[in-house]
């Protein structure tokens, strides 16, 4: 327990052991990451069509191999692009394009707290909750995992209560830190 407290001061007393992942990392600025990824892809010949919506994936009737994608551009023009492969990254909406995929929405709610700088130095994963420290003391708390909610928008009292309970279960002192933002 003593070694655990040295790694995570203030950890709730019920935790007697933990796993340390020395190489665990995080990205604080996802926008910079995505810009760098886009730049690398473009340098390899990838074309991005921003604001375009894929309408259909057409497959060969016999082999079921992908033949083309049909999309509507941001300007409303319908285009057909022959291809043998496509990256499907539409998340919970993927089933609209490939109905046989067993994909469904799972709602996640999160919040952030403003803690003292360096109050938490490591990511903490607990049952149903995790705490991610940022350099400025901000702590990202996540996330609920709510099946059966469909694509419902908004925060729920139950989801927010679950996050608060997770904070108390992992790092009780964080329960007194002011909330900064809540999202789903």
Regions found by a protein language model. Give the residues of each.
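Flavin (FAD/FMN) cofactor-binding and adjacent substrate-gating region
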Residues: 1-44, 49-50, 56-65
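Structural motif
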Residues: 63, 68, 85, 110, ...
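A generic structural motif
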Residues: 22, 70-74, 114
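Active-site lid/adjacent beta-loop-alpha segment flanking the redox-cofactor pocket in flavoenzymes
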Residues: 118-184
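Central helical "cap/lid" subdomain
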Residues: 76-125, 153-159, 173-175
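A generic structural signal for well-ordered coil/turn residues at beta-strand boundaries
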Residues: 15, 65, 77, 106-107, ...
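Conserved beta-strand-loop-beta-strand element in the redox core of flavoprotein oxidoreductases
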Residues: 55-81
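Glycine-rich nucleotide phosphate-binding loop and flanking beta-alpha elements
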Residues: 34, 93-96, 147
């Amino acid at each position: 327990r003593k070694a655990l407290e040295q790694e995570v001061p203030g950890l709730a007393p019920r935790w007697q052991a933990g796993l340390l992942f020395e190489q665990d990392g995080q990205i604080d600025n996802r926008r910079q990451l995505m810009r760098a990824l886009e730049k690398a892809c473009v340098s390899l010949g990838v074309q991005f069509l921003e604001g375009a919506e894929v309408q259909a994936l057409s497959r060969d009737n016999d082999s079921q191999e992908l033949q083309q994608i049909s999309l509507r551009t941001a300007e409303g023009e319908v285009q057909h692009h022959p291809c043998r492969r496509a990256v499907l990254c539409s998340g919970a909406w993927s089933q609209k394009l490939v109905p046989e995929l067993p994909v469904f929405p799972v709602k996640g709610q999160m919040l952030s707290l403003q803690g003292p700088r360096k109050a938490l130095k490591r990511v903490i994963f607990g049952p149903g909750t995790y705490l991610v420290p940022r350099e400025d003391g901000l702590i990202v708390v996540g996330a609920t995992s709510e099946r059966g909610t469909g694509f419902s928008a908004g925060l729920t009292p139950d989801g927010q209560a679950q996050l608060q309970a997770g904070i108390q279960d992992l790092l009780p002192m964080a329960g007194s830190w002011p909330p900064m933002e809540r999202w789903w």
